[in-house]
Amino acid sequence: MNIIKGNIASPLGFSADGLHAGFKKKKLDFGWIVSEVPANVAGVFTTNKVIAAPLKLTKNSIEKSGKMQAIVVNSGIANSCTGKQGEKDAFKMQQLAANKLQIQPEYVGVASTGVIGKVMPMSILKNGFSKLVKNGNADDFAKAILTTDTHTKTCVVNEEFGSDTVTMAGVAKGSGMIHPNLATMLAFITCDANISSQTLQQALKDVVEVTFNQITVDGDTSTNDMVLVMSNGCTNNNEIKKDSEDYYKFKQMLLYIMTDLAKSIARDGEGASKLIEVTVKGAKESSAARMIAKSVVGSSLVKTAIFGEDPNWGRIIAAAGYAKTYFDINQVDIFIGRIPVLIRSSPVKYDKEEIQEIMSAEEISIQLDLHQGNCEGQAWGCDLSYDYVKINALYTT
């Protein structure tokens, strides 16, 4: 697998555009991804009981056909908790895209991110569509989907499948309200491989479980979380069948892109100064390891300790202890970076200057070994700073 420079339109047969429509004052806020041909599609959506209108519509469209040819996204207004009007507006958004591209409406996915409770202004939406072009600036799409993010999040890879080169690209947004169970967290992945919708859905489901579902910034799950994967078959490779060697290679591509995007989201948490990576090994089951890792990285006390550059392993073991899974508390090792701070649940003396150097870094690695099995899991998050409170206190309602 090769990591390459590119954007969401790097796979064969895809194009994209992003622009300023007027949902925000100045920044780019509207864009789309378009495939030359209908692509097979897979999706996972928020587990929040309050589901935004665009998600409902997109999910229903996917269930009808398993195909998608375009994804249109606005940022600044979430179109969530907007009642019947919100459903009409999401449908209108789908219709306008379909009419402009001359494709079936159910082949258009719609997504929105921003302030909850505001109705979609149709004049701004129509203005956006009047300026969108099929082969526009694909790099601008990554900018157009952002809200409180500080930078774009893109990853592109390719891999040889026999004599064919398959390319996969991913783009995401997310900075706050991040605690997906698949903030707003949106991710879109394009690929030119020949793979069925059913096989694609299984691959996405498996990989989401160990990537996007393992990040947390603030413990809030958005009403608009969505991950979509489109694969249009333009490479003309032999169809990737489930459980084949090619399927394993395809999943590795998906895993790399989604891990990279997940870590980028965690690193870009609102007000964050440090990325936290927690690895739990020696568990009886991978699900238990992931649960403990996410419990640790989601702890407000762990987050504030990391912000204060304090190697407070007591907060780490406490957060592990309230994860909803069993482990033997007397057998745990904890490492912060390369330094052991707890061995078999007994404190270890460490060099304060050495550990202070580790705590001052922009990326903090925490490892727990449960000594109960051979399974492991990871989770990612960020520290909790004064700026997080400031950003969200000032965010519009």
Curated annotation (Swiss-Prot):
One of its GO terms (molecular function) is L-glutamate N-acetyltransferase activity. This is Arginine biosynthesis bifunctional protein ArgJ. The lineage of its organism: Bacteria, Bacillati, Bacillota, Bacilli, Bacillales. Pathway: Amino-acid biosynthesis; L-arginine biosynthesis; L-ornithine and N-acetyl-L-glutamate from L-glutamate and N(2)-acetyl-L-ornithine (cyclic): step 1/1; Amino-acid biosynthesis; L-arginine biosynthesis; N(2)-acetyl-L-ornithine from L-glutamate: step 1/4. It is found in: Cytoplasm. One of its GO terms (cellular component) is cytoplasm. Catalyzes two activities which are involved in the cyclic version of arginine biosynthesis: the synthesis of N-acetylglutamate from glutamate and acetyl-CoA as the acetyl donor, and of ornithine by transacetylation between N(2)-acetylornithine and glutamate. It comes from Staphylococcus epidermidis (strain ATCC 35984 / DSM 28319 / BCRC 17069 / CCUG 31568 / BM 3577 / RP62A). Its EC number is 2.3.1.35, 2.3.1.1. InterPro entries: Arg_biosynth_ArgJ (IPR002813), ArgJ-like_dom_sf (IPR016117), ArgJ_beta_C (IPR042195). The gene is argJ. Keywords: Acyltransferase, Amino-acid biosynthesis, Arginine biosynthesis, Autocatalytic cleavage, Cytoplasm, Multifunctional enzyme, Transferase. It comes from the Bacteria. One of its GO terms (biological process) is ornithine biosynthetic process.
